[in-house]
């Protein structure tokens, strides 16, 4: 399956799949994940479901995906707590643009996924909105300072 690149906001998003999809899969990605993207898409394509997959690049991983500010855990870079901005980008730019460019059904099932800190972002996003049909959090960074306490007080929607 060949990727198309679509500029959404100021980000070059990789789009795979087809219009009229039953599922819209959104994955926040870092540069390190793009090398294995083709095999991930091939595995998803083996299902019997029609899908549209958008790989959304994240530049400042620690800032854009962290739900609140926190000091550095490893190394020197702390966390900027800009997950709300990233979620807003998804809901106000990415999803509307994809729905405009691809004739997706009104009831398309939206699944947000991510690995590591992007997995934590996906879990956090599910506590902020009921927009997502499902969450795929692979090895989420639940070690993030304050996450366990937050998660107990804020159920997934």
What is each stretch, according to the model?
Residues 1-157:
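Non-catalytic cap/lid and distal C-terminal segments of serine-dependent acyl enzymes
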């Amino acid at each position: 399956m060949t990727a198309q690149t679509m500029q959404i906001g100021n980000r070059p998003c990789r789009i795979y799949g087809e219009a009229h999809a039953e599922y819209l899969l959104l994955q926040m990605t870092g540069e390190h994940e793009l090398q294995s993207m083709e095999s991930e898409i091939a595995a998803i394509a083996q299902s019997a479901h029609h899908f549209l997959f958008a790989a959304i690049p994240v530049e400042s991983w620690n800032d854009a995906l962290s739900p609140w500010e926190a000091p550095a855990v490893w190394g020197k870079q702390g966390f900027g707590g800009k997950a709300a901005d990233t979620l807003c980008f998804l809901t106000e730019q990415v999803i509307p643009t994809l729905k405009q460019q691809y004739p997706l059904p009104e009831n398309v099932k939206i699944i947000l996924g991510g690995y590591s800190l992007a997995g934590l972002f996906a879990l956090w996003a599910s506590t902020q909105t009921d927009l997502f049909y499902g969450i795929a959090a692979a090895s989420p960074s639940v070690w993030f300072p304050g996450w366990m306490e937050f998660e107990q007080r804020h159920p997934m929607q």
